[in-house]
Amino acid sequence: MVRPKQSIQSHRKDEHVFLAEKFHQDDRQNDFDGLRFIHQSLPELAIADVDISTQFAGTTWQSPFYINGMTGGSQQTKKLNAQLAQVAQIAGLPMATGSQSVAIKDPTLVDTFSVIREFNPAGFILANIGAGNDLSVAQKAVAMTQANALEIHVNTAQEVVMPEGDREFYWLDQIGEIVANLDVPVIVKEVGFGMSAETIAKLQSVGVTNIDVSGKGGTNFVTIENERRRDKAYDYLSDWGQSTVESLFESQAFQTELTILASGGIRNPLDIVKALRLGASAVGISGQILHMLIKTGPTETAEQLLAWQAQIQSIMAILGARNLTALQSAPMILSPNLRHYLNERHLSL
């Protein structure tokens, strides 16, 4: 039997997974290490008193973290999406798909994304497309997985370094059109380069109310795309962007009006709690969960993520925080580098 030739787009999806795992580092340092909670010896509560649930677009998520957009678009990534959907179902986590643009261009790849709904029929699923797509593409992406919400990713740095990437970035008006007309909530997200206050203000101006600031510190798409280039020409951009912590600082002035989500460089439950303390309503995790899945399989990954939920509850109990609102008042100190960033950007915590 002759196997059908894999498309360029499908091959790229497989390359992304391979390179994300190749460059994954469990012990990688990032700006979450520059945040320290002040220990509270008398929290005056029980662990059972702590509520870790959060609200998103009128729905309650029992966990304050979710599986962020990763993959799909090839037979290999179909298997990964099926396993991730199993993990999401067992652990009770919302889950985002990877970019579905490839399946909208090539309908033979639809099942590499729709498999998520097959394996998690009652779960909260977020569809995913790139900025620059119009309303009809957004509607097709949502229908493909019967999604509860849509992520639109903005990824100029990745596109510039990607050999076959886009070279025109007139995105804002189309984002606004989708937000105004789509039947499900829309999240606009970065892909690991962070967001500035200026970017957040522009998104707010066209009606965006949900933003994932997705900063550097984890999966690095400049490094991944540069590795795919023959000339390796953009290695000097490997540190481009704002960290997730810096991006949460940038979002401070908008947090009462917008729902801010955080992702990028999340390694453990303490990182999640720190992001929630800085104002994130929920925290997305991609690379760390993919690494767990590849190394241990779906059952052990789900068990680990259930353990993370219990550990988040325990950390909040140590801090005397009964819920996420109380957590945002927990005393915290910053490293000199983070304090310098706040000063240079005229921001406050």
UniProtKB/Swiss-Prot annotation:
The UniProt record lists the keyword NADP: yes
Keywords, alphabetical: Cytoplasm, Flavoprotein, FMN, Isomerase, Isoprene biosynthesis, Magnesium, Metal-binding, NADP
InterPro entries per UniProt: Aldolase_TIM (IPR013785), FMN-dep_DH (IPR000262), IPdP_isomerase (IPR011179)
Localization terms from the record: Cytoplasm
Sequence positions that bind FMN: 69-71, 99, 128, 189, 214, 219, 265-267, 286-287
Residues annotated to bind Mg(2+): 159
Record carries keyword Protein transport: no
GO cellular component term of the entry, any: cytoplasm
Top-rank lineage group of the source organism: Bacteria
Coiled-coil boundaries: none
Entry's family note: Belongs to the IPP isomerase type 2 family.
Subunit structure: Homooctamer. Dimer of tetramers.
Name used for this protein in its record: Isopentenyl-diphosphate delta-isomerase
Organism: Latilactobacillus sakei subsp. sakei (strain 23K) (Lactobacillus sakei subsp. sakei)
Organism classification: Bacteria, Bacillati, Bacillota, Bacilli, Lactobacillales
